[in-house]
Regions:
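Alpha-helical segment proximal to the catalytic Tyr-Lys
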Residues: 121, 161, 165-168
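Conserved glycine-rich cofactor-binding loop
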Residues: 16-17
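Conserved NAD(P)H cofactor-binding loop of Rossmann-fold oxidoreductase domains
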Residues: 84-89
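Residue(s) in the substrate-gating loop at a strand-loop-helix junction
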Residues: 136
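C-terminal helical subdomain
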Residues: 170-172, 176-177, 194-236
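Active-site helix of classical SDR
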Residues: 116, 152
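Substrate-binding pocket helix/loop in short-chain dehydrogenase/reductase
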Residues: 92-93, 100-105
Length: 246
């Protein structure tokens, strides 16, 4: 077992900020080259010669097959994926416009499946590697106002479980990480957030440490699933309107 990733190239989605940026930084510190995918890098603070940003809006799923196919042809050295891109939207089901349901499914589920589909043949050709998918504690238990969001995360978890069986013979390890509330911009557009006490939230670096830890175990061992929770679970509403947490 080693804690170095020298010579490996991994793709990280959602790489410009939050969990994706923290994962990218951790991988870079361990010697990997990171192909970072994000909608834009305007606020990205990563400064490393082995970090290669690729501006790409994964929410535009109709364009992804062609774009990802071209990207795969130019990055045949890939041996791993860490899919961090995603967003949250909450509210009772009837409050969701149909287009908002589709948008959440497209980014949280379909785009992850497309990215894995595009690069899995390369990873297998290169002798195997790792795919890490970002789930959520909402993939473990559904909650009020989270029907659509939880559905996307439960689906990602099922995708990971099935892939694990499908890809083992090709030496590809599949891991899903299910974090609780992480202190990121995820909550900027929502009407609730974790309480201010640091024990009420997870830091992006905590998730990154878990991801890197899964990569460092012996090649014949798979870290199937990692569940991360804050020590406490206080949630603060930004509004007194109990009927709208979107």
């Amino acid at each position: 077992m080693t804690d170095r990733l020298d010579g490996r190239t991994l793709i990280v989605t959602g790489a410009s900020r939050g969990i994706g940026a923290a994962v990218s930084q951790c991988l870079l510190e361990k010697g990997a080259t990171v192909i970072g995918i994000a909608r834009d890098f305007q606020h990205c603070t990563i400064d490393n010669a082995r970090f290669r940003p690729v501006p790409l809006d994964l929410a535009q799923v109709s364009a992804l097959p062609d774009v990802l196919s071209r990207l795969a042809k130019t990055h045949t050295e890939i041996t791993g994926l860490v899919c961090c891109a995603g967003r949250g939207r909450f509210g009772s089901l009837e409050e969701f416009a149909y287009k908002h349901i589709r948008e959440l499914v497209d980014l949280n589920l379909t785009s992850q499946m497309y990215v894995v589909r595009a690069f899995m043949p390369i990873i297998k050709t290169n002798g195997g590697g790792d795919v890490v998918l970002m789930g959520s504690e909402a993939a473990l238990s559904g909650g009020r106002y989270g029907a659509v969001y939880s559905a996307t995360k439960f689906a990602v978890r099922g995708f990971a479980q099935a892939l694990r069986h499908e890809c083992a013979a090709a030496n590809v390890r599949i891991t899903i990480v299910n974090p609780g509330m992480v202190r990121t911009e995820f909550f900027n557009s929502l009407k609730f957030e974790p309480g201010s006490d640091p024990d009420n939230y997870i830091e992006p670096e905590d998730v990154a440490s878990a991801v890197c830890g899964a990569l460092f175990v012996r090649r014949g061992t798979v870290v199937d699933e990692i569940n991360l929770s804050p020590l406490k679970r206080v949630v603060r509403r930004k509004t007194d309107d109990d009927d709208n947490w979107r």
